[in-house]
Structures are given as C-alpha cells and as structure tokens.
Design a protein with these regions (language model features):
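Membrane-interface "cap" regions at the ends of multi-pass membrane proteins
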Residues: 1-35, 237-240
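Selective recognition of specific alpha-helical transmembrane segments in multi-pass small-molecule
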Residues: 99, 103-107, 139, 156-172, ...
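Transmembrane helix-bundle signature of multi-pass membrane transporters/permeases
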Residues: 53-60, 215, 245-253
Length: 254
C-alpha cells in the first residue's frame, strides 16, 4: 500500500487523481527558475538546448522520480528523514538546516518575483508580497486537497497553455533559431576557444560551471527532492510514479 492509502489522514495523506497530482507536481517544480534561467542561459547559444534536453532526460527526471519513489517506499517521509535513515542523525540535522535555509531563499524568490510582475497591474509591491504570504500560510495550514488541490491545477494549466502558445508562435512567425553547429563547427583546443567561454558574454561566465548554475531548475535541481515527497503522499498506486515524477520534469524541460 502507498502512504496515501496506508496512512490516510485527510490532511497530508490523501488519495488524489493522477492528473491532479501531475499538475501540482509540475507547478511545484516549474516556477520562476526554469523560465528566467532558460532566458538567461540563451546567452550561451545552442549548448543551452543540449543541457536542457539531456539534463532533463538523464539527470533531472531521474532525480525527481527517485526522490518521489524513495519517499513513497518509506511512508511519505521528507528528504531530511530519508537522509537520516541511511546516513545517521548528524547528517540528517545538517540536511535539515541546509534544506530550511535553501527553502527560505527559494521562498523569497517565489514571493518577490511575482510581486514585481503583479505590481505593474494593480497595487503596490508590498501589498502583493503580503497577499502572497497570506495565501502561502492558508494553503499550508489547510488540507492539501482544499486549496492546493483545487488552485494549483489551474495555474499549471495556465503555464502549459503559455508554453503551447509559444510553440504555435514559433511555427507562425518562424523566428531564426541558431543551429547547433553554427558556433561549434570549427572549434578546437588550439585555434578557437569560444566554446570554452572566452568571448563576449562568456568571457566572465564560462560554460563550465556557469551554464549549469544558470540553467539548473530547468535541467536538474535538488530543490525538487523537497517537493516530490509532498505528492508521494497522495499517489494511490506506485505505477503512477513514473508518469507523475519523471513526466513532470520532462514537461518542465519542454
């Protein structure tokens, strides 16, 4: 039995439809990071495409799937508890502090960035920051199917609609997209160092490691390991794990 069935409590452990879990998982991991990161990563040219595609398939989606299934197999526990089980309490406490600090920083970004965008539509920036914080608190305190289970799928649908609209726009406008070999056709160690990150923008931001930091959430992100267990508590059958956890990350990459 999955935790949603064996430990059902009507709050965190609740069986929900697979499509709804997928949409919530997708929105949990596809925030401002993959959007702004990919835009900034475009400075690196075609190599950014490769990192997003191969990073998602072989790293990010595998990471999300494993973190979700590990949590499911261990009663729906969070990341620090999983670390503590296999690496001891000391490592668990270190991971707990580390996770809290990173989640605080991620939370600040996820509050401040929407507030800046919404400020131009209505109200002040501080007004939106307070409103978003109030929403977060209410959504956290209520059972997961009351607010998150009802609103998140709508937000996720909006994000997917935006992505498909952009895809249609590409086919309608047919903008120029640089080919992979346009920057790499004559690269070699001795004569051309552009691919190592020594020209223009990349002079101070070499491909390694800056590209992998700039486009992190869009290809692989350890932050997702804190989100997958939340949905692992709502899955009815283990066979739903791959389309939900692996599939949500692939969708984010797309």
């Amino acid at each position: 039995l999955t935790p949603a069935v064996a430990k059902a409590d009507g709050v965190d452990y609740i069986v929900m439809p697979g499509w709804k879990i997928f949409m919530i998982q997708f929105l949990n991991i596809a925030g401002t990071g993959p959007i702004f990161g990919a835009i900034m990563g475009a400075w690196y040219g075609p190599v950014a495409y490769l990192w997003i595609v191969f990073g998602c398939i072989f790293a990010g989606a595998v990471h999300d799937y494993l973190s979700g299934m590990l949590s499911m197999r261990h009663g729906g526990v969070g990341l620090p508890e999983l670390v503590g089980k296999y690496l001891g309490n000391t490592t668990k406490n270190v991971m707990l502090v580390f996770s809290v600090l990173l989640l605080v920083m991620v939370g600040v970004v996820f509050v401040y960035s929407p507030a800046i965008i919404l400020e131009g539509i209505y109200g002040s920036r501080m007004w939106w920051i307070v409103a978003i914080f109030i929403y977060y608190i209410i959504a956290t305190m209520l059972p997961i199917d009351k607010i998150i289970g009802k609103i998140y799928p709508l937000f996720a649908f909006s994000l997917l609609f935006m992505a498909f609209a952009l895809l249609i726009g590409f086919f309608v406008k047919l903008p120029d997209i640089p080919e992979l070999w346009s920057n790499l056709s004559d690269c070699n160690y001795n004569d051309n160092t552009a691919w190592l990150g020594t020209d223009s923008f990349m002079t101070k931001n070499p491909i390694f490691p800056c590209l992998f930091i700039t486009i992190a959430c869009g290809a692989i992100s350890g932050f997702h390991a804190t989100q997958s267990p939340l949905m692992a508590r709502c899955v009815k059958h283990e066979k739903m794990g791959r389309p939900i956890f692996y599939g949500a990350m692939i969708t984010e990459g797309v």
